[in-house]
Structures are given as structure tokens and as C-alpha cells.
């Protein structure tokens, strides 16, 4: 785990149940981008869920900017006990010209070579949402504050078998 998170547990995908759920989603994603895995229309036989884990993030904990290995990665937010609107009102965040407290954020290089950020503000509306993205895309999770409940997320990496 790249993060500064105290509790993270490895999960097992028994009988490839989770991979079978993810495969059509990944196929749609890759087909939309017109990415060909092989000469076949379906990529079902080419995917493997390499790693699967759950993070229990407490206030002040964070995941610094990092990427993953493989083809695709994902995060599913299971519990988000904070609201970004309140988090962005914390004095040190409010006084910032770019508050990111509690956000999930991608970092990428745009078409003219400038490094850009894309933040996804976190609140309970994101519970149950899955975000699928290329594994090499750099991302980070900012800490949240003033909340004793845990933020719970499930993440994983998909590779070509």
C-alpha cells in the first residue's frame, strides 16, 4: 500500500466472482476508447484480478500521489462519513485558493505538457460508486478532519493474464 493508512486488508476473489462482475464494465470502457486487447471482440479470457484490498481510512490519514501496475485499477467507495462542503470550510482549506481536503484526485499531463489535477469531492453520494481508471494514472487521496468515523473503500488492479 502506497498510503499513510493504518488499516488495509487483502481480500480474496473466490471463484472470480468480482472479476466476472468487472469484466463487462472493463470491456465497455476499453471499447469506448477503442482499445484492442487482441484479435477477439471479447477480452474476458485475458483479464485477471491481480490484487484486491479494503482501506479503512481514519481522519488525518492519506494516500500520497501514486500509481498502480497492470491494465486497469478501480476504487469503490463503501462509506464516506464526511461531506466535502464541510471539509472545504475548515479554516486552513477555506483560506486556500484550491481546497482539496478529503478529495480523491487524479494528476495527469495535458496535451501541451502541463501537469493538471482533477479532483473528485467526497460525500455520501459517492457511496457505492466505482471509479475505473488506467492503472498508470497517478492519483491521491487527501486526508479528512473532524470526524472519528472511517472512510471505507475497496480497490484493486486488473492485469492481462
Language-model regions: role of each:
Residues 137-140:
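Short, charged beta-turn/beta-strand-edge "cap" motif at the junction between a beta-strand
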Amino acid at each position: 500500500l502506497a498510503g499513510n493508512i493504518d488499516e488495509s486488508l487483502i481480500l480474496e476473489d473466490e471463484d472470480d466472482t468480482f472479476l466476472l462482475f468487472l469484466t463487462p464494465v472493463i470491456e465497455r470502457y476499453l471499447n469506448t476508447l477503442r482499445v484492442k486487447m487482441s484479435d477477439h471482440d471479447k477480452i474476458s479470457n485475458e483479464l485477471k484480478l491481480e490484487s484486491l484490498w479494503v482501506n479503512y481510512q481514519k481522519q488525518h490519514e492519506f494516500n500520497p500521489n501514486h500509481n498502480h501496475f497492470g491494465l486497469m485499477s478501480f476504487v469503490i467507495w463503501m462509506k464516506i462519513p464526511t461531506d466535502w462542503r464541510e471539509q472545504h470550510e475548515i479554516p486552513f482549506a477555506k483560506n486556500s485558493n484550491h481546497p482539496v481536503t478529503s478529495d480523491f484526485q487524479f494528476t495527469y499531463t495535458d496535451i501541451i505538457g502541463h501537469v493538471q489535477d482533477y479532483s473528485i469531492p467526497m460525500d455520501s453520494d459517492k457511496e457505492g460508486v466505482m471509479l475505473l481508471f488506467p492503472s498508470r494514472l497517478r492519483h491521491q487521496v487527501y486526508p479528512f478532519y473532524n470526524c472519528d468515523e472511517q472512510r471505507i473503500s475497496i480497490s484493486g488492479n486488473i492485469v492481462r493474464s
